[in-house]
């Protein structure tokens, strides 16, 4: 119990320390169930072939609202003492769209206190901006004619392909797991068309989870998740309960500063079969946008082969039911 209170205190301290303005990158309310999405070092940690299909509609009902689709697949690769994986991403917000394909490798080191993994993920992103969806105060939009009267904005669809690199570390012990990762680093920036080039800041992620031993077949997991671009940061605290690896329910709170307060998250999950899991999260908006949308919906379908592939990593000393 002393370990638990230390963990809770650290979570509250980190949440308060990082309560700056704004938010960075795409939000993800089911992050604790799909950690490979933001940390390539988590590959293979589920000890079998694992796949996830994620869909998120943020601020539903708001025109041009952010939408995200993601496919993650990873599996142990003992020949190289680690794991391999790939990620397919499609995101859209307003006139912008991104489609990415990335592959990853992570090396897993076993020690007396747990498993330590370091991983890297790299690939390409196709970025596009549809100028026909943009409007300016002085633009000319008679009929099908489009002229923004702004040389920095395109009047048609422009696109470009950019390389991207991501990296992370992850530790898994008997009662505690934590990871630190960097995502969305574009070494050459992003180029759209002939004239538009920009260099977005990479995102940094910290994830920490504590495992409370089961009682009455229920396991409790308090979690802290922090995202930052080193200018703006946002913290989220959540707790979830798993019952017999069959049903899960959780609640979370995102944003602890007056300018970063974002949402309260309610989530639930169920095991559909021996290999499939279904999760759903609903974000109740708390920011200034809360009156303009109908909440945020997120759906995750996960698959786990349920078999150890080959031989290599030993079973955990204490079984930590992460599957829900």
In which residue ranges do the predicted regions lie?
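Subset of outer-membrane beta-barrel
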Residues: 23-324
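Bacterial N-terminal signal peptides
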Residues: 8-16
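Bacterial Sec-dependent signal peptides at the C-terminal "C-region" and cleavage site
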Residues: 16-23
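Bacterial N-terminal signal peptides that target proteins for export
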Residues: 1-9
């Amino acid at each position: 119990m002393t370990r638990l209170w230390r963990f809770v205190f650290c979570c509250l301290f980190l949440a308060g320390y990082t309560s700056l303005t704004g938010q960075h990158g795409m939000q993800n309310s089911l992050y604790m169930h799909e950690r490979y999405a933001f940390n390539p070092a988590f590959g293979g940690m589920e000890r079998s072939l694992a796949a996830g299909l994620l869909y998120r509609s943020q601020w539903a009902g708001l025109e041009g609202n952010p939408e995200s689709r993601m496919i993650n697949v990873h599996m142990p690769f003992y020949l190289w003492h680690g794991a391999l994986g790939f990620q397919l991403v499609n995101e859209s917000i307003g006139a912008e769209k991104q489609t990415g394909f990335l592959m990853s490798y992570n090396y897993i080191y076993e020690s007396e206190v747990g498993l330590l993994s370091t991983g890297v993920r790299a690939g390409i992103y196709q970025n596009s901006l549809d100028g026909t969806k943009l409007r300016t105060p002085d633009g000319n939009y008679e009929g099908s004619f489009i002229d923004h009267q702004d040389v920095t904005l395109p009047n048609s669809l422009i696109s470009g392909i950019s390389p991207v690199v991501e990296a992370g570390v992850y530790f898994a012990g008997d009662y505690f797991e934590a990871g630190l990762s960097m995502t969305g680093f574009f070494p050459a920036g992003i180029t759209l068309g002939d004239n538009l080039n920009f260099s977005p800041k990479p995102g940094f992620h910290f994830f920490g989870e504590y495992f409370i031993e089961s009682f009455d077949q229920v396991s409790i997991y308090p979690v802290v998740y922090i995202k930052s671009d080193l200018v703006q940061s946002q913290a989220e605290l959540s707790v979830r309960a798993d019952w017999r690896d069959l049903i899960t329910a959780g609640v979370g709170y995102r944003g602890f500063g007056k300018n970063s307060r974002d949402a309260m998250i309610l989530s639930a999950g169920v095991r559909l079969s021996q290999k499939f899991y279904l999760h759903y999260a609903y974000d109740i908006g708390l920011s200034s946008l809360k009156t303009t949308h109908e909440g945020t919906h997120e759906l995750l379908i996960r698959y786990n082969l349920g078999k150890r592939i080959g031989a290599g990593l030993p079973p955990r000393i204490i079984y930590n039911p992460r599957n829900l």
